[in-house]
Amino acid sequence: MIMNIHIVEQPEFAAVFTLPSPARDHSGIGHLVEHLVFRTSHLFPERHNLFALTSLTQCKMNASTTGDTSYYFAQAQTSEDLLLLIEYLYTGLMTRTYKESDIEQEKSVIQHELAFYAKHPAYQTQSQIWRGDHHSCAYQHWGGFPDVLTHLTANDIDAYKSQYYVDHQLSIFASGILKEDIVTACNKGRLNHAKLSNHHNQPKIYQPKLTTNDTEDDMPVPVFSWWLAGKYQASVLRQFPKWQIQWPELYVEEELNHQGMFAIRYVGEKELSQFSTWLACQTVIAGSEMTKMTKFPESIQALLSSEISNTSQPRNLSSKSNAAMPISQLIDEPCISHLARLPITNIHTTQTLDLTSTTLATAAEPPTIIKRFTGAIAFELGSYQPKTIMQLLADIGDKEICIKADLWLIKFTPISLEKMTAIVQTSAFWAPRVRGLLYTMGVFELAGDIYVWGAGDIQPTTNISYIQALIDSSQH
């Protein structure tokens, strides 16, 4: 094994895998691979392992993919359980082949996810800018455009993972465990991968098909982009809120592109000359790389900070490089593109849920990762509720159901926590998410009541009826 293993001294039992996952196009292949890593593997075949574990234990596990890197993290209460999570993640990372149904269902999940994000104006603007920018320094949409995502195949996944999801590209930063124990845990995940052959084909490049609506408009909105080195990004973003008060059309990218640069954008031509003159006079200071993944648990952020300190980047900047510099000395003429129109994408769902079945598997065995978990398994341990769902709590009152657009919340009372613990371990409970019928779902307890929620759901009444039927059947 030639994976890079780094042990960091900190009290938490935590680990994070990092590996390159460049966005080669607008398909979101790195995003799809991220979903598939958690979905299934030869050691952990059940599609709901992740959901059951994070709902019933104090473990934390998630991932995030940017334009050039993917991060997979885990945090547990004991070293034994952290090593189990590492084995689970590593096995998923090394898995290359998937059933067509798994790929199509995760595509559907991502389409629901992208539709969920598309409700936010800032996301729409960013997507329009990226889709309309065809310069060599342009960002590729690592989350994917729905109409491009659909083209990805099992062969593309195999080719992509064989190129990037390999040991010599992989690093793990961990605390609370020993290096040799990590090697042992990962070797378990390698048993069925020893004879993996190299996939010699490159993943196909998929880009949006240009249509008349994309390129022609009565009044196309221009976008002017000035590109700066990544070391100035933190300085620009610190000043951005103040700048935007004066210039509402100003937009600053929060990620780096494949060349390690970021863009300062100006949308439209209103007062463009004045803005250009003003921008050239602003000053910035070179700094270290920005903190990564600030939404991750603090223990994971500490591990990632250790990763940065292990790079070859110079730590001591000279006083000259630390001095404030006018932006005019750092930029060339702006690149000019246009806001693209975003196509309307219909989410095609072929899966259905049987609402009449009397065998809803509420007594099914727990998934593999729960069987092997050494810590406590209890419904209330993993209680979690996102802010978007908590907003529905104020409106549900004495009602059993609250629906707002693609968000929903169901209240169950009374039902025992022991019974709910059993239900949440079943594949039947997670069927709407696993089959790609919504973006995400979850369950939590509050003041003695049980709540089940869903988000990014284009057919909320169907999935609500299914969950209600499932819970009702378990009480007879």
Regions found by a protein language model. Give the residues of each.
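Small-residue-rich helix-loop
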Residues: 455-460, 468
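Catalytic adenosine-cofactor/nucleotide-binding cores of aminoacyl-tRNA synthetases and other
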Residues: 450-452
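His/Glu-rich zincin catalytic helix
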Residues: 1-49, 158-283, 324-435, 465
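Structured beta->alpha junctions
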Residues: 21, 76-78, 456
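Acidic/histidine-enriched segments that form metal/cofactor-coordinating
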Residues: 42, 50-160, 197-212, 219, ...
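Small/polar loops that bind or transfer phosphate-bearing groups
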Residues: 74, 174-175, 455
